[in-house]
Amino acid sequence: TQKMPDLLERSKRETIVIAQIEDPQGVDEVEEIAATRGVDGIFIGPADLAVGYGKTDQTSPELHAAMLKVGRAAKKNSKPYMSFVPDAMKAAEWNEAYGLSVFFVASEHNWMRKGATHEAQEIHNIKSENTS
């Protein structure tokens, strides 16, 4: 364990602040947010942001424009630009399209589902190889 003064001092050195942009107002104010001293990175939540624009998916021109705007603000202020992505393919796509550089990939539920699906397919392959 650490003494409280030591813990507090350590937390000052190791704590980071990531601004989370998940609604249209955040997009409107992203220049100020990204320029704020003490903000270490910008995270965009495209699913929530799409809902904020009244959309049910992530393909709208409004969302595309918002992701570009947030990316420009992050780059202008030398802040990492980050988001949740379902997989490495989407990370590569968004890196190129929007300049995202930090990715939170999938979720434990998605990994378990993919792993279980893969293992089930392997079992089915064994069965079909030895059945006539």
Please provide the spans of the model-predicted regions.
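Expand to "…catalyze enediolate/carbanion chemistry for C-C bond making/breaking, isomerization
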Residues: 1-132
